[in-house]
């Protein structure tokens, strides 16, 4: 299968090329040139698969056995999920009043990003060992991506990872999960800015195509196609767990509620919908509501500033995966997508063309949820079920409660739960509840930390480039010594 840039200028690449890229050289994001179509028979066959089984089928569909033979692919995916705490890897909790919560947080760092990052890192290691190459991974994080990326890469002999975290804008636990990893190939920077601000030096570095090529740079943020590919399995598993039957014509709809920051899970869900999965998508955001405004009014524009909320991993103003959604909505029209995104980058504001907005609002519903509603939802879920939600999961569950309180017709619904409440004791306390903290999270408090500060006024881009150049020098020296 071939992958093309949403902006249509960069040459097409195979899965390996997309895997090792951040942004495409023309500033776009890689997408499959053609989407396969799944028929009813395939969906029925897949309906009995485990979550890892679905990941295997989806990856085989989008990678191609000539690049990665099926048995080797299956081994890599088994290895990726070997350290998850739940035997199902992903678990559905069926609670009162039709509330279905899909727990995506049974990995090492208690967040959904463990799922896609553990697989992506296995794919990277496979190709790096085959090609005898080294890469430097650069990640900007609002909280969970950084720790999951570090966990999946730490100690890998062919990879270094640089993580930029927003100092004071993620929770103490999230920060400790990153700064307590002291492996030689892990390099953490604490940035005096928010997650959108720290994305700027990263985007600038990736825009220098010669620099990226020279130093084998890549990203593990959800701009990486492999992340989106694995996340498609969330939607298939949600559907098969919640659909009442596969015997009806047409197949029944299931509503999937997606707590959304950078929109990787939304892009994955929309692709799943496009290839034949009968789901209705609901985007649930906090007060950083750019996607909600885009769905409701076609207004894809920045607010004055990022608002700090209890659902801190979603405190994002620039949901870069919307570019993938726009490209799909436009019928893979790279000219339309490029014009939209270049205008947004220039002016921070775009009004979607009428036809595009109409297609978006047909495909996706949206809701924006305040901190007060988050804590009320956490409290209600505990009162009704003795079940603790993280604040991000509560954003999704709030939509479910709105629907049942209005006595809306009951389509089966699944709320994606991206993180464990254990990672957000501050939010649990704000909801008037008692945090439950696992021993391995408590232990973080007593570990040594390592983090380099990027202060306001420092040249963040230069600091990042210098670090990358140092790592390249060290790798070249190591490779030379090994060959001698």
UniProtKB/Swiss-Prot annotation:
| Cofactor dependency | pyridoxal 5'-phosphate
What are the protein's UniProt keywords?
A: Cytokine, Lyase, Pyridoxal phosphate, Secreted
Name the EC number(s): 4.2.3.-
The UniProt GO MF terms for this protein read: cytokine activity; lyase activity; phosphatase activity; pyridoxal phosphate binding; serine binding
Pfam families listed in its UniProt record: PALP, Thr_synth_N
Q: Which GO terms describe its biological process?
A: 2-oxobutyrate biosynthetic process; serine family amino acid catabolic process
Is Ion transport one of the keywords?
no
Mind telling me which InterPro entries this protein's record contains? Thr_synth_N, Thr_synth_N_sf, Thr_synthase-like, Threonine_Synthase, TrpB-like_PALP, TrpB-like_PALP_sf
- Residue list for modification N6-(pyridoxal phosphate)lysine: 113
Class of enzymatic activity (EC top level): lyase
A single Gene Ontology CC annotation of this entry is:
extracellular space
Gene3D superfamilies tied to this protein: 3.40.50.1100, Threonine synthase, N-terminal domain
Q: Which family does it belong to?
A: Belongs to the threonine synthase family.
This protein's name: Threonine synthase-like 2
Organism, by scientific name, is Homo sapiens
């Amino acid at each position: 299968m071939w992958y093309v840039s949403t902006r249509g200028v960069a040459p097409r690449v195979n899965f390996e090329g997309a895997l090792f890229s951040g942004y495409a050289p023309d500033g776009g994001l890689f997408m499959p040139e053609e989407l396969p179509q799944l028929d009813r028979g395939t969906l029925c066959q897949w309906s009995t698969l485990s979550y890892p089984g679905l990941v295997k089928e989806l990856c085989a569909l989008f990678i191609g056995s000539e690049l990665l033979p099926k048995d080797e692919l299956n081994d890599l995916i088994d290895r990726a999920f070997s350290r998850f705490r739940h035997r199902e890897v992903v678990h559905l909790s069926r609670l009162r009043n039709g509330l279905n919560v899909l727990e995506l947080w049974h990995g090492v760092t208690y967040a959904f990003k463990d799922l896609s990052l553990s697989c992506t890192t296995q794919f990277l290691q496979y190709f790096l060992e085959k090609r005898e190459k080294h890469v430097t991974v650069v990640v900007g994080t609002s909280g969970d991506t950084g720790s999951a990326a570090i966990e999946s890469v730490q100690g890998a002999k062919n990879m270094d990872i640089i993580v930029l975290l927003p100092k004071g804008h993620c929770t103490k636990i999230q920060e400790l999960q990153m700064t307590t990893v002291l492996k030689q190939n892990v390099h953490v920077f604490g940035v005096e800015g928010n997650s959108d601000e720290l994305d700027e030096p990263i985007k600038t570095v990736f825009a220098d195509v010669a620099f990226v090529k020279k130093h084998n740079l890549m990203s593990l943020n959800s701009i990486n196609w492999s992340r989106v590919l694995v996340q498609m399995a969330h939607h298939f598993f949600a559907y098969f767990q919640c659909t009442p039957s596969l015997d009806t014509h047409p197949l029944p709809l299931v509503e999937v509620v997606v707590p959304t920051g950078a929109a990787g899970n939304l892009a994955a869900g929309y692709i799943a919908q496009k290839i034949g999965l009968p789901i209705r998508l609901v985007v649930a955001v906090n007060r950083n509501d750019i996607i909600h405004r885009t769905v409701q009014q076609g207004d894809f524009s920045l607010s004055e500033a990022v608002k700090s909320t209890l659902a801190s991993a979603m405190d994002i103003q620039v949901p870069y995966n919307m570019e993938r959604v726009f490209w799909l909505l436009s019928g893979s029209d790279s000219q339309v997508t490029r014009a939209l995104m270049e205008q947004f980058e220039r002016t921070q504001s775009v009004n979607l063309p009428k036809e595009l907005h109409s297609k978006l609002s047909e495909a996706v519903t949206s809701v924006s949820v305040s901190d007060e509603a988050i804590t009320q939802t956490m409290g209600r879920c505990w009162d009704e079920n003795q079940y603790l939600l993280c604040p991000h999961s509560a954003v999704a569950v709030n939509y479910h409660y709105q629907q049942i309180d209005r006595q809306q017709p009951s389509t089966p619904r699944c709320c994606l739960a991206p993180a464990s409440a254990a990672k957000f004791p501050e939010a649990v306390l704000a909801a008037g509840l008692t945090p439950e903290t696992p021993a391995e999270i408590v232990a973080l408090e007593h570990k040594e930390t390592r983090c380099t500060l990027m202060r306001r006024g420092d040249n963040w881009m230069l600091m990042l480039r210098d670090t990358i150049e140092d790592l390249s020098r060290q790798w070249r020296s190591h490779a030379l010594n090994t060959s001698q």
